Amino acid sequence: MSIGLIGRKCGMTRIFTETGSSIPVTVVEVIPNRITQVKTVETDGYRAFQVAYGKKSSARVNKPLAGHYSKAAVEAGNALREFRLGNEELTEAKAGDELKVDIFKEGQVVDVRGLTRGKGFAGTVKRHNFRTQDATHGNSLSHRAPGSIGQCQTPGRVWKGKKMAGQLGNVYCTVQSQEIIKVDVERNLLLIKGALPGAPGGEVIITQSSKKRKEDK
């Protein structure tokens, strides 16, 4: 993982280009991420930043975390996340500094990770896009049933990973190579092209595109 930011998904809108074409964008609010720890090759074997996001009452922070925050002289956050760094990335930053939206620029492509909406228990038609069975011709109870899930005596079991009904959503998902359309430094907003995983108000993690990093090597 490369350097990134933790933000809050606000919702979707659209913006118009000079030629009049419409671009759907997701608005992400990035409250400044506070660096709580800097990991180095000498002490930890790799370079990374640990950042705190959001705010939390000091009464709700346990003693080990409270000491961790006070050592870095930063306010307690809702969550701690770690971003691994390259050899040349943000070499001057230190604990207590803030990371803001200006570490990204317009036109840059990023990967965004978020928790998808939970949709509860779902059947195979909704969950795995199975086709339905015949509406008539003797079928009266199995219109949305999955059908056979295995063979006979051999192998005598259902294979692991078989697509069946179950919990849908509420899993982490990463969308790759999403373009940043606009960076609003004054309001701490990123406008990212397309849809991002999760419900409005959910946490999203924005990092540099992994595919772009491979191309640059």
From Swiss-Prot:
Region (Disordered): 135-154
InterPro entries in the record: Ribosomal_uL3, Ribosomal_uL3_bac/org-type, Ribosomal_uL3_CS, Transl_B-barrel_sf
Any one GO CC term of the record: cytosolic large ribosomal subunit
GO molecular function: rRNA binding; structural constituent of ribosome
Keyword Magnesium among UniProt keywords: no
Domain of life: Bacteria
BP GO annotations: translation
Record-linked SUPFAM superfamilies: Translation proteins
Changes after translation: Methylated by PrmB.
Keywords linked to the UniProt accession: Methylation, Ribonucleoprotein, Ribosomal protein, RNA-binding, rRNA-binding
Location of N5-methylglutamine modifications: Q153
One Pfam family per UniProt: Ribosomal_L3
Subunit details: Part of the 50S ribosomal subunit. Forms a cluster with proteins L14 and L19.
Family recorded in the similarity comment: Belongs to the universal ribosomal protein uL3 family.
HAMAP family for this protein: Ribosomal_uL3_B
Chain's role: One of the primary rRNA binding proteins, it binds directly near the 3'-end of the 23S rRNA, where it nucleates assembly of the 50S subunit.
Protein name listed in UniProt: Large ribosomal subunit protein uL3
